[in-house]
Amino acid sequence: MQKIIVLIGPTGIGKTDLALDLAPKINAEIISGDSMQIYQEVSIGTAKPTDEELKRVKHYLINQRSIFEEYSVKDFVAEGTKAVDKIVADGAIPLVVGGTGFYINALVNQLQLGEPGEYQTSVDPQWEEYLKENGENKLWDLLQAKDPAAAEKIAPQNSRRSLRALTVISRTGKLFSEQQQKINPRYDALILGLNSDREEVYQRINMRVDKMMEHGLLQEAKFVYENRSREHQVIQAIGYKEFFPYFSGEKTLDECVNKLKQASRKYAKRQLTYFKHQLPVVWLDPLQDEKVSEKALRKINEFLNK
């Protein structure tokens, strides 16, 4: 079974920096495991590597699609497996780096995507009524409270899947996420995870948002806002929708920036919940441990040589 390295962690933890440090040392090429970095038109809010960083190490699945093109987890898996094959054929090590847990899990393990009959199953009337009264975001919040791992792989605006998941939970008394198929590995993967003290992670997220604002995030968000009438993949992405009330004159810029920081912190919490429940992770602390790069390199070499 082909060996690959995976580097995951919550937003803002320092995955890109560590990946760029490790890649030359292990002769690796990087596959982005972020569902938003595939899009050409948005770079700041998606925290893409810079042009200089992209030149330092060869990357895959970055800037490959327009936001107006469909791109699903199935597309990601199809293109990700091709990237792995290409990297291996070139004599290098595949290094998957990102924070979209479900996408990475689907690549590493042969998850069943789009289960047959999933949408045909009837849903409990109580959840349909809840949706009518409270809206799709509140419905998703309810799912997130009941089954965080399931919520991680369902977009808030996809009320159909939220209804389905809540129905399965209420009918079976078991978590929807635990009723997915057994793990069937596609690759022999060493999964390294980055995490640290929660308050330090949150502080880094806040600082990162401030830096994004300095680099032009507002202009990027305005592009997304001005194209909101066209159906596209980024309209609900964290980093853009939070500014819509500012552009419509409903909130101040400071209010929207604070909302983005809050949303980013909540997203980091959801990411960690998914990683801890769904993937076998070897955890490292890049904020407290000065030798995190050395430790990661040692674990990688042990894995590749066994």
UniProtKB/Swiss-Prot annotation:
In Pfam terms, one family for this protein is: IPPT
The family database entries (InterPro entries) matched by this protein are listed as: Dimethylallyltransferase (IPR039657), Guanylate_kin-like_dom (IPR008144), IPT (IPR018022), P-loop_NTPase (IPR027417)
Q: Look up the EC number in the record and give it.
A: 2.5.1.75
tRNA processing as a keyword of this entry, yes or no, is yes
Q: Kindly indicate whether the keyword ATP-binding belongs to this entry.
A: yes
Q: Which HAMAP family match?
A: IPP_trans
Protein name as it appears in the record: tRNA dimethylallyltransferase
The top EC class, named as a word, is: transferase
What GO molecular function annotations does the UniProt record carry, in alphabetical order?
ATP binding; tRNA dimethylallyltransferase activity
Organism from which the protein derives = Lactobacillus johnsonii (strain CNCM I-12250 / La1 / NCC 533)
Name the segments for region: Interaction with substrate tRNA: 34-37
Show the Gene3D superfamilies listed in the entry: 1.10.20.140, P-loop containing nucleotide triphosphate hydrolases
Q: One biological-process term from Gene Ontology?
A: tRNA modification
Q: Where does ATP bind?
A: 9-16
